[in-house]
Amino acid sequence: MMSKEDIKQEFKEMEGDPHIKHKRKHLHQEMVMHGAVASARKATVLVTNPTHLAIAIYYQPDETPLPRVLAKGEGALAEQMMKAAREAGVPVMQNIPLARALMATAAADQYIPSELIEPVAEVLRLVRKMAANPESQP
């Protein structure tokens, strides 16, 4: 019969040291968070659900055939993305239905899903209009 220590040792050998696994997971989360915040700074627009969701969208007609989702964030990450976008001068647009739909169906670093092309295009038109006529902004 195996002792408690033998069982622990066997588990470590099979699954890896829990402390190392925790550290690796933490580092991965930091890398993801840093990447999402950096993507928010490069975005054309950040679509939000006021405080809980943020989706960074990039579109330059001469560079990309369709808008791309650069990154998605929820909770604290979404707040950091919004802060970074504002600091970088990226428009932050509140659109609850679109933010929820993008969060549910779009993948980071992919083109937007075909069913969301029209709503995203409308947001991009509004951003372009605001950029062309800054004195009309609230």
Predicted region positions:
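N-terminal cationic and glycine-rich segments that engage phosphates or anionic surfaces
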Residues: M1-M82, A88, V92-A104, A108-P138
